[in-house]
Design a protein with these regions (language model features):
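Sec-dependent signal peptide recognition
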Residues: 2-10
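Subset of outer-membrane beta-barrel
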Residues: 20-403
Length: 403
């Protein structure tokens, strides 16, 4: 147990630094960058479902009502990392980028039997990371280049409680503390030495709280189980500080800005069907209503982000002596719209993955492979391959052995 606690503490400390190398996408220049959907590894392989999922093998922070599905004597923690390879193509050519990142660290344990459970963790909310240069001219006499760069992102720490209010209904809530900063720079350079180079750097820093509520209805008859779930977050203005620094060859100017920013209202629903802990089929819908939020006082346009996901998981026999029969096999698809109007590209992905249970211990190593495409006619196109691996570790910390 002591080794597990030490490992968990070290993982949480390491997990406090997210998003520094999570993306290289030029589209992360807009809005708050690339958004993270905060799903456990097993559900990512099922296309990204989660709202209607309820399992004692996974910690599911996307649905706070699901925590009471944990075993009454089991402490769980989960840590995940990812590798992302992306090909970008536009009118200026094609390029490839590779990124790696710690995805999340979460834990979960029961407080009172199967009626009350607690979960906590740290994970990224968004990531910004891009560098590119565009060249052009003003007539035949003046040639210039505009260099863009950005980095940073927002991280969130959460704590959540789940309650079984009866044998077929669970309620839950997560409280999130969000923090982080985004820095974006633009540099205008002329080939003519008589013209000044101008640089502008903008930095946004946030510290804020928000809440997510979850509800699940579940019913088992014979070897069949069905779960219906829903989530909701209210729109929330967050605390922030921001400044703009403008540098030229002759002078520097620093301005403290006063703009309003908000997190969106979020709502969604999901359903899952399970047969004998062998076959699970699930689908979700979620909306982040960015269109009704303030972003730079409304000076830049955001729009609602809609996300549809569906997936399936199969295990031939979870208690078989044959290892291949105890493995989990997963497939999924997802489709989501962009939340920024500046670069309005849908994201389409297909996923597959495997769960490898370790012998005689309550640990499952999950792997996810995702291929996705973002883009449209005449826009920046991205084709990406993402690999995610996570260790979902369960230990009987509350079991008293008889002497």
């Amino acid at each position: 147990m002591k080794r597990s606690i030490a490992f968990l503490v070290a993982a949480v400390v390491a997990g406090c630094v997210f998003g520094q190398n999570a993306t290289s996408s030029p589209s992360s220049r807009f809005g708050y960058g690339e958004l993270n959907d905060n799903l456990p590894g097993a559900y990512r392989a099922m296309g990204g479902v989660g709202i209607g999922m309820r399992s004692n093998r996974s910690i599911n922070p996307a649905q706070p009502a699901s925590y009471t599905a944990c075993d009454s004597m089991t402490f769980m923690f989960d840590i995940a990392g990812s590798f992302l390879y992306t090909n970008y193509g536009d009118a200026y050519g094609a390029r490839n980028r590779a990124n790696g990142n710690l995805e999340y660290v979460t834990l979960q344990f029961p407080i009172w039997r199967r009626y009350i459970a607690f979960s906590a963790g740290v994970m990224p909310y968004s990531a910004v990371g891009y560098t590119f240069t565009l060249a052009d001219s003003l007539g035949a006499d003046y040639h210039y280049s505009m260099a863009y760069s950005g980095d940073g992102g927002f991280t969130q720490v959460y704590g959540g409680l789940s309650f079984n209010i009866c044998d077929w209904v669970a309620l839950g809530a997560n409280a999130y503390y969000m923090f982080g900063n985004i820095t974006q720079s633009r540099t205008l350079s002329f080939t003519e030495s008589s013209l000044n180079t101008v640089s502008q750097s903008d930095k946004l820093t946030i510290n804020s709280l928000r809440l997510r509520y979850g509800l699940q209805f579940f019913h088992t008859w014979g070897r069949h189980t069905i779960v219906l779930g829903g989530i909701f977050e209210n729109k929330q203005r967050f605390s922030r500080s921001e400044y703009t620094q403008i540098e030229t060859t002759t002078a520097d100017t620093v301005n403290t800005m006063s703009n309003a920013f908000e997190m969106p209202m979020v709502y969604g629903g999901g359903i899952s069907y399970n047969y004998a802990n062998r076959l699970t089929i699930a689908c979700d819908y979620q909306c982040q209503d960015w269109a009704k939020t303030l972003y730079f006082n409304g000076a830049e346009t955001l729009q609602a982000r809609h996300r549809w996901t569906a997936g399936v998981e199969y295990c031939h026999n979870p208690v078989s002596r044959n290892y291949a029969e105890r493995m989990y096999w997963r497939l999924g698809v997802n489709y989501s719209t962009a939340y920024t109007a500046d670069i309005n590209r849908p994201d389409i992905g297909v996923t597959m993955g495997f769960g490898f249970p370790l012998r005689n211990v309550g640990t499952i190593i999950n792997t996810t492979f995702e291929y996705g495409h973002k883009g449209g006619s005449g826009q920046l196109n991205e084709n990406y391959l993402r690999f995610v691996v996570n260790a979902a570790i369960a230990e009987n910390w509350f079991f008293k052995r008889k002497l």
